[in-house]
Regions:
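Gly/Ser/Thr-enriched, mixed-charge loops and adjacent short helices
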Residues: 1-127
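Proline/glycine-rich low-complexity loops and linkers
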Residues: 4-42, 148-218
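Short glycine-aspartate micro-motif
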Residues: 69, 131-135
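Gly/Ser/Thr-rich loops at beta-strand to alpha-helix junctions
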Residues: 73-79, 140-141, 184-186
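Generic structural signal for residues in well-ordered beta-strands
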Residues: 93-94, 134, 199
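Short, high-confidence coil segments that cap the C-terminus of an alpha-helix
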Residues: 128-130, 218
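Short acidic-glycine loop/turn motifs at beta-strand connectors
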Residues: 137-138, 147-149
Length: 218
């Protein structure tokens, strides 16, 4: 829907004004338009609390029976991880790795795979390894999931998440459908078939997933 609307734009208007201070929360006036500066970290964390059972996860994390690591790779997800995992779920400080965003990603490459997230991989394959590990990329839309000395391929993690989504409060009624890009394996297809829901294969690109999300199909 958004993509279709963008193709109908015929002109746009500009207005001269002082720069908006995006570091200060609150509302500002720009001509006849009101601009509100929000805290996306807080808003995102509050949304996640409606989708997942934070009380249950908090109990697991603080039971002494489960340990995890998350590598933000010095990218955008660091502040989100601190808010959710540290402040709301109560993980220990050493749970989060590379959680401070850096313009050069700490000199690394924020691609969550076995090569560039080697620091996390080494932890998960060590003698006293945690039970769960994850890393996310530069803008937080791709991830790598690890178990205790176990690597989960991204296509399989999509299938596992889809198969178990009904166990979370936000998706208790089930999924409308599953979408995957063409390079992704067909593991998710098997889940969709088992659940009796639609499976959409798209070209690579968020605009294709966005259209399905806007239409309520995935």
């Amino acid at each position: 829907a958004i993509y279709s609307a963008s193709k109908r734009i015929e002109h746009y208007l500009t207005v001269e004004n002082d720069a908006i201070d995006v570091d200060t929360l609150g509302t500002r006036q720009l001509g006849d338009m009101t601009i509100e500066v929000i805290d996306p970290v807080s808003d995102y964390a509050e949304l996640m609390q409606t989708l997942f059972d934070f009380d249950c996860i908090h109990s697991l994390i603080n039971s002494g029976l489960f340990r995890m690591r998350f590598d933000a790779m010095h990218a955008v997800t660091g502040p989100y991880a601190r808010d959710i995992f540290e402040q709301r779920l109560g993980v220990t400080p050493d749970t989060l790795m590379n959680a401070e965003p850096s313009e050069d990603f700490g000199g690394g490459h924020p691609d969550p795979n076995l090569v560039y997230a080697k620091e996390l991989v080494d932890v998960l394959y060590a003698g006293n390894a945690p039970d769960f590990g994850a890393a996310s990329d530069g803008d937080g839309d791709r991830n790598m999931i690890l178990g205790h000395r176990c690597f989960v391929t991204p296509s399989d993690s999509l299938a596992v998440l889809a198969a178990n989504a009904h166990l979370t409060p936000g998706y208790r009624q089930g999924l409308a459908g599953i979408a995957r890009s063409m390079p992704t394996s067909q593991a998710a297809d098997r889940v969709a078939d088992k659940l009796g829901i639609a499976l959409f294969e798209t070209p690579t690109g968020w605009k294709f997933f966005g259209n399905l999300l806007d239409a309520g199909k995935a």
